[in-house]
Structure formats: C-alpha cells, structure tokens
C-alpha cells in the first residue's frame, strides 16, 4: 500500500490513444515511438483490475508521422506494470564526460527524487569492467573526477557499471538502480566532429525496426542478429530512421561501440512535397504556433529516455519536414538541455533561412561532385550524407566515389546507407508459395509497390550481394590494402598454376579450310565453322556434340534495375534496346590463320546510335582454347551504354 502503481506503454503505433482503469479515464497520449506512462494508483483495487486501451489509427499526429513504411495500428512494444516506493529516483542523468587528457573521467550525476525526500540519501558505486571500484560514496551534485578511465569509442566500447542506492530517512534501502555508462567527449573542433579529440567518420546505415513475420514488433533476437551483421561488415554507425528505437537497441550500441544519430519521431513530407516538387505553402509543422509544443515535446521525450547512452552522439530533429520556427525550437531545446551532443537535420537544404537548425551540413543522395563542390567552398560546417547508396533491388554501385572523399576532405565525415533491411512481409502467393510481399501484394491501391525494399539485407535477414561492397569499402584503408594484396597474390598463383598446366598440354596443329561461305577450323577433338554470311560461328562441335544454336550477336541492353527506373535511365538509354534488335552486320575479316592460332573478326553497325559500332573477335588456339572478345569503341558522345555482351 506504500507503493505507487504505474503503467508503462512501451510504444503503441497509435498516433493517439486513451487509457482507462476499472472504467475510469486515466489519460491520453500521442507519439507512436516513445513511451507513455500513467499513474494508476488512484484507480486500482485489491483484485479484479481491468485496464483498457483505445487506439486510434487517425489523429492529428498523422500529419507528422508520414514515414515511408507499412502502416499498422496497435501495440508493438512491451507493456508493463510496475510499482514505485513512496520515495524513489524519478530521473537519473549520469553525465559521463572526458577531460582533454583522455584518461580523466568527469561524472556529474543529476538526480530527481519523487515523494517524501526529507532525510533521504543516495550513494553511488562505480566499478570498471573488471569489477574494481573507482568510486563509492554519496551523490552531492558535484562533478566526480576519476583517474585512469578508458574512453568509449567504436574501437574501445568500454562501459563502467554505476549503481545508485536510495535510502529513506531511517536508512532503509528503497531503490537500487544499475546503469552502464561510457566516458567520452564529442565536440565540434574547427568545423570537424571529433570524438575524444579524433575526427570521426561515420560508416553508417539507416535502420528501420522490422521483422517479416511481426512487422515492427521486433524482439531481442532480431536486434542481436542485426548487431552481429553490423559488426561483421564494418558498419560503425546507425541512424534511427525516422523515430526512436527500442531501448534495448541503444544498450547494444553502447556495448558494441556503434555511433548513433537518435532521430525524433517526425516526418511530414506529404505536406510540402507534391509529386516531387517542393511546395511548402501548408507545411506542417513549419512555423505554425499550434505545432510547436507538439514537436518539442517529441524531442524532449526522446532526449529524456536516451540521454544516458554513450552511443548517442547526435540528436536529430526528424526527417523530411522542410524547415521553420518549430523545428528550430527543437534544436534550441536540444542545445539548451544537452550541450554535450550535436544536432542534425537535413531539411534546411530546402530553406536556408533556417540553417541554424543543424550543426552539420546534411544531405540526401548528393552526387560526389556536389559534395566536393561544397567541401571546396571552405564551409563552416562538416558534411554528412544522412542517406546515400539507395540500395533498392540490385544496386549499391559507385560506393567508392563517396568513401574516398573521407581521405581527401577532413570535413567529409561519412554517410548512412539507405537502408539496413527490406521491409517486406511473408505471405502466400497465388501459386501457394511462401514469399516476401511488398506494397501492392496485399490488394491495396494506391501503393508504392516495392519502394520499401531498400535494404542491404533482405527482410528475412539474409545478406544481399551488395553487402560485399559495404564490407569492403567500410573497412579501414589498411584492411582494404591487405585484402587487395591477398587477392592479388592468390590470383597470380592461380594464373601461374593454370599457365603451367596449359603449357604442358600437347598441341595439335589446327587445320584451316577456307570456303566461299565458311571458314573451317579443325583441332584434335573439335571443329568449328565461321559463317561469312551468318555473322559469326555457325557450328562448334566437341567430340562430335554440337554446342551452338546460332551465331552469337553483340548485345547492348539489360533488364533495368529499380534505381535505373528511379533516375529515368531506361528512357535515356532506350536507343540501346533498339540496337539489340536492329544491329547490322558489316562483314568478316580473318586476322590470323595458321596452325597455332586462328583469329576472326566480325564487324557490326548500330544504326539506332549514330556513329556507334561494335566487333566480336574469336580466337582459336591449338591447345583447344576459344577466346571471344566483345569490343565497343568508347565514345563519350554516345548515350550511356547499359552493357556489352553476347
């Protein structure tokens, strides 16, 4: 009876909710991704208590929760009931800083007590990873200096265990609160973000919370699996797109040294992006006074929940919500409340009048030369890509162009791939197969179809081929050089082994027969006919078995990828699709014809691309090898070539 009962709703994708206890109204809440807590003490009975939650799909919050993802309604994070003693620790902020010498920790505990506080005491015990006590004594509000501290970073994610003990006036223990903290110093120095005095480069990824069976209701297994993938592929940073994640994820990032941009649950792109055009006449929240308290409250909820996590280096005001006085107020709140972290927001690129919102220049999908142009302008702010390498379908090419900027420009401080995991749901298709379904696969219209399939892993967690590039380019330069050297040595050894084996093969002179319509080549166990009129080899027999159906032709088209279609590439390169059909044959030329080697060239014109041509060169060797070279004389005046192949 001396306890106060509270109900914590971990999170409800609610946009809006009402709570009742035993038929009595308790409270109301919005914001789908930060906890809502209610005091149930006045409403509970000894037994037979009933708690009801009414969740609404539509509310005013819908305007600012317009993230690109599947829409669900209901409870998707833990719900719990807990009791608090009459006097308890209502809030804890263990401000763990680091002095310039990088060995002296500066711990400033800020506590808030609730209840009858007369005569109570709070003590702190801090131990290192080996369990050795660094401090044991009262909490006075003063900063505690600690010698021999190991700084927290990606390479050394050292955490210290704090234990706060609250006793009442009679000396009876009321609460013991454990917490793991990391000592680090994150700051802007001469326009460069530095951690513990060293420039930091984010080899990052955006991460939605997702499971193909459970949607956003992920669990510890999902998070541990994701963390293992990040560590195995040299990813050192995560942006929580576009809402705060479950608290366990922050614990894992603390333990594994993963840097975090912690993002407020705010996105309103539908209020100012009109079919790709920018039209902010009724942007929400913008500078509308009725929205200011709402968005600042979301920033406050996130900060108060996550402020003790060493992994959180940067607060983000949200995503794709244009700019205005309301988001500026969020930044002002972050700066005033927590000077130890920086503030991020990309949307000011569309409205430079509010450039003060962000401490860094953040852009999405900027091209390498655009980034270079910014960095050459001697900017005040460093540059990051909050989204890049849009990994939709078969993609992620060109990552090297971005990663190498980090070596050239100290103010280029990395980026966050879009994104970690495809958002898709297991379902049974019309053929009775269990497959991953995307937008439109569930009968809904209108839809964005597979636009949620942007991950470097599939929805079931399997790595995509693109992950090989991520792992390579996110490795350190030294590790890349070592891998390149090992690959080169292995390739050279293989070449030597194959060459020796090939040279040891007995050769048999080729027999060449020139006819009016064909050129014949005969070896020990094979024979080949090149057709002058047929524009290539008409027959290839090995041990009497025919291997050709018809003469190969040069091909210039391939299936377009998702990102091809997104940037209009198929339309720009459509002439090459026609070239596949309408290529013209311009004749055959025998370049060499002897007992050791026969080399034949076939020439082709490409009428749909004026001035373009191609050739196929076939080389037959006495050892029995056939080599085919497809040659396209490159001209940068031609349209982009999708591919060249047979």
Predicted segment positions?
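Secreted/periplasmic carbohydrate-active enzymes, especially glycoside hydrolases
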Residues: 1, 7-260, 298, 313-314, ...
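Substrate-binding/catalytic cleft of secreted carbohydrate-active enzymes
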Residues: 227-230, 237-460, 465, 469
């Amino acid at each position: 009876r001396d306890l106060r009962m509270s109900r914590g709703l971990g999170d409800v994708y609610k946009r809006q909710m009402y709570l009742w206890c035993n038929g009595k109204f308790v409270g109301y809440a919005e914001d789908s991704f930060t906890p809502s807590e209610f005091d149930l003490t006045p409403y509970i009975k000894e037994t037979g208590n009933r708690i009801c939650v009414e969740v609404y799909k539509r509310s005013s919050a819908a305007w600012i929760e317009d993230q690109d993802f599947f829409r669900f309604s209901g409870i998707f994070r833990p719900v719990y009931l807990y009791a608090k003693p009459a006097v308890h620790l209502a809030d804890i902020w263990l401000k763990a800083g680091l002095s310039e010498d990088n060995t002296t920790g500066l711990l400033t505990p800020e506590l808030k007590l609730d209840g009858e506080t007369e005569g109570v005491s709070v003590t702190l015990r801090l131990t290192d990873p080996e369990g050795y006590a660094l401090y044991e004594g009262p909490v006075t509000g003063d900063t505690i200096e600690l010698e021999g501290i190991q700084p927290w970073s990606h390479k050394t994610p050292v955490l210290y265990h704090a234990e706060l003990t609250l006793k009442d006036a009679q000396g009876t223990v009321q609460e013991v609160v454990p917490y793991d903290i990391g000592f680090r110093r994150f700051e802007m120095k001469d326009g460069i973000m530095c951690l513990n005095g060293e420039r930091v480069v984010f080899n990052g990824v955006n991460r939605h919370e997702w499971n193909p069976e459970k949607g956003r209701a992920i669990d510890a297994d999902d998070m541990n699996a994701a963390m293992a993938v990040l560590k195995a592929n040299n990813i050192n940073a995560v942006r929580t797109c576009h809402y705060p994640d479950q608290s366990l994820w922050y614990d894992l990032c603390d333990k594994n040294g993963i840097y975090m941009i912690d993002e407020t649950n705010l996105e309103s792109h539908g209020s100012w992006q009109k079919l790709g055009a920018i039209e902010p006449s009724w942007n929400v929240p913008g500078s509308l006074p009725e929205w200011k308290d709402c968005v600042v409250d979301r920033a406050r909820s996130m900060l108060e929940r996550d402020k003790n996590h060493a992994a959180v280096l940067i607060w983000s005001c949200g995503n794709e919500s244009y700019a205005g006085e309301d988001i500026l107020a969020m930044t002002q709140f972050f700066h005033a409340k927590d000077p130890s972290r920086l503030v991020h927001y990309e949307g000011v690129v569309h409205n430079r009048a509010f450039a003060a919102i962000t401490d860094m220049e953040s852009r999405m999908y900027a091209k390498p030369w655009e980034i270079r142009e910014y960095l050459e302008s001697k900017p005040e702010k460093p540059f990051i890509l909050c989204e890049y390498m849009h990994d939709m379908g078969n993609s992620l090419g060109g990552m090297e162009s971005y990663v190498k900027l980090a070596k050239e420009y100290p103010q280029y401080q990395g980026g966050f791939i879009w994104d970690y995991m495809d958002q898709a749901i297991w379902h049974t298709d019309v053929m009775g197969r269990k497959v991953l379904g995307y937008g439109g696969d569930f009968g809904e219209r209108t839809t964005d179809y597979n636009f949620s399939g942007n991950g470097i892993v599939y929805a079931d967690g399997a790595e995509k081929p693109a992950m090989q590039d991520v792992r390579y380019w996110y490795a350190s330069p030294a590790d890349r050089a070592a891998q390149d050297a090992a690959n080169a040595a292995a390739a050279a050894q293989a070449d030597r082994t194959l060459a020796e084996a090939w040279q040891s093969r007995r050769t048999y002179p080729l027999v060449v027969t020139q006819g009016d319509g064909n050129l014949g080549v005969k070896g020990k166990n094979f024979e080949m006919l090149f057709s002058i009129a047929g524009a290539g080899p008409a027959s290839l027999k090995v041990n009497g078995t025919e291997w050709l159906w018809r003469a190969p032709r040069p091909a210039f088209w391939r299936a377009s990828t998702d990102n091809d279609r997104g940037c209009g590439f198929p339309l720009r390169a459509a002439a090459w699709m026609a070239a596949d059909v309408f290529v013209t044959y311009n004749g055959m030329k025998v370049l060499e014809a002897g007992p050791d080697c026969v080399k034949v060239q076939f020439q082709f014109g490409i009428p749909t691309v004026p001035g373009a041509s191609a050739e196929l060169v076939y080389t037959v060797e006495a050892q029995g090898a056939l080599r085919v070279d497809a040659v396209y004389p490159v001209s940068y005046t031609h349209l982009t070539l999708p591919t060249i192949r047979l």
